[in-house]
Design a protein with these regions (language model features):
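Nudix hydrolase/Nudix homology domain
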Residues: 2, 35-48, 106-150
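Conserved Nudix-box catalytic region and its N-terminal flanking loop in Nudix hydrolases
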Residues: 18-72
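Acidic, metal-coordinating catalytic segment for phosphate/diphosphate chemistry
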Residues: 1-20
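Active-site-adjacent beta-strand/loop module that shapes the phosphate/pyrophosphate-binding cleft
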Residues: 75, 81-117
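Localized chelating/binding microdomains
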Residues: 22-23, 87-92, 114, 130, ...
């Protein structure tokens, strides 16, 4: 399945966690969105996970699509499977994934070349509230749970 097939029904939060300094950074894209490849539509509503998610929503397929489309090193980014959020849009269900860089330092130059910058959660005020709530869930999972060790 190609990146073009995957992206309409998925969004990705990109994060980097430095366990030494306990710094958690999130990518913010040039359009102000915190989601790749684009923000959710304003009409999107949170929903429970569907009974049967198809292959287009598979976390590894989404990770591979991001690697392919953005030229990332697959050995440096992991899918955090415990993060399971969904939104209903006019086009159908959208899964929001959390991908975390495992490099010792945040790949700031790489992200900037893609049109984004890394920020701490507190620096993201003014972003869409729905996206900030998703980042708060990611923060709780990574800092307070097992997501930082994945």
């Amino acid at each position: 399945m190609s990146a073009a097939d995957i992206t309409p029904s998925n969004r990705v939060i990109l994060a980097h966690y430095d366990s030494y300094s306990a710094a958690l950074l999130f990518a913010r894209w040039a359009d102000g969105s915190l989601l790749w490849p684009e923000a959710l539509p304003e009409s999107a509503m949170a929903m429970p996970a569907p009974q049967a998610a198809g292959p287009a929503h598979d976390g590894e397929a989404v990770r591979q699509a991001l690697i392919e489309r953005c030229g990332l090193n697959g050995g440096e980014v992991v899918h955090v499977g415990e993060f399971a959020h969904w939104a209903q849009t006019d086009a159908g269900p959208v899964r929001i994934h959390l991908l975390r860089f495992t490099t010792p330092d945040a790949p700031k130059a790489l992200i900037e070349a893609l049109g984004a910058r890394f920020h701490h959660l507190a620096q993201l005020r003014g972003a869409a509230m729905s996206e900030l709530l998703l980042l708060r869930e990611a923060f709780n999972l990574i800092v307070g749970g097992s997501g930082g060790r994945a």
